[in-house]
């Protein structure tokens, strides 16, 4: 049984937990305290508000313990705001959070709430079926290091990438009925 934590401080927590509960041999867990970090096999940092999540990571003394676990190889997946939390650099924001993934992210790259959109894509590495994507005030990656694999582009922007044990997506798979990305992440563990 794989115990996958969802950072339970702010954002789309229950939606990720619900998706994980539908995958065999996965035990979903809402992670809130640093003492729980060593009890999980992987972690999802959900979409929400990156500034609030970053502040709460600091307030709950989670930043350094999470950074240590991720750097030691624990699989982690950041969706939307979670992508920003993982990024080493953010083009339009001086704040930094975990700084573990060799990507440069444009915060709110797709614009404001009114610019939110949905689309469907094919991505054989993740699913043989079309995958629905939901973008809400979404960031995108403007630059990756050579050790980062670009998984998906939408409108020529990088919206999904992977670096070893780290996965980052601009969109919200937890807001669709599709389990493809959650299964893909579970297979990384």
Curated annotation (Swiss-Prot):
One of its GO terms (molecular function) is glutaminase activity. Keywords: Glutamine amidotransferase, Hydrolase, Lyase, Pyridoxal phosphate. This is Pyridoxal 5'-phosphate synthase subunit PdxT. Gene3D superfamilies: 3.40.50.880. The gene is pdxT. It catalyses: aldehydo-D-ribose 5-phosphate + D-glyceraldehyde 3-phosphate + L-glutamine = pyridoxal 5'-phosphate + L-glutamate + phosphate + 3 H2O + H(+); L-glutamine + H2O = L-glutamate + NH4(+). GO terms for cellular component: cytosol; glutaminase complex. L-glutamine binds at residues 48-50, 107, 136-137. InterPro entries: Class_I_gatase-like (IPR029062), PdxT/SNO (IPR002161), PdxT/SNO_CS (IPR021196).
């Amino acid at each position: 049984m794989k115990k996958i934590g969802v950072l339970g401080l702010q954002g789309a927590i229950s939606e990720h937990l619900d998706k994980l509960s539908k995958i065999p041999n996965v035990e979903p867990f809402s992670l809130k305290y640093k003492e729980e970090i060593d009890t999980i096999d992987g972690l999802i940092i959900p979409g929400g508000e990156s500034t609030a999540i970053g502040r709460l990571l600091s307030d709950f003394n989670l930043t350094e313990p999470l950074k240590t676990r991720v750097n030691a190889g624990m699989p982690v997946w950041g969706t939307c705001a979670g992508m920003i939390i993982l990024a080493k650099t953010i083009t339009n924001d001086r704040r930094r959070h975990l700084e573990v993934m060799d990507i440069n992210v444009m915060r709110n790259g797709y614009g404001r709430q009114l610019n939110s959109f949905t689309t469907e894509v094919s991505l054989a590495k993740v699913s043989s079926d079309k995958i629905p994507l939901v973008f809400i005030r979404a960031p995108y990656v403007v630059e990756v290091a050579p050790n980062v694999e670009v998984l998906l582009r939408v409108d020529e922007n990088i919206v999904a990438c992977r670096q070893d044990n780290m996965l980052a997506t601009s969109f919200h798979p937890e807001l669709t009925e599709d389990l493809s990305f959650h299964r893909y992440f579970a297979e990384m563990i």
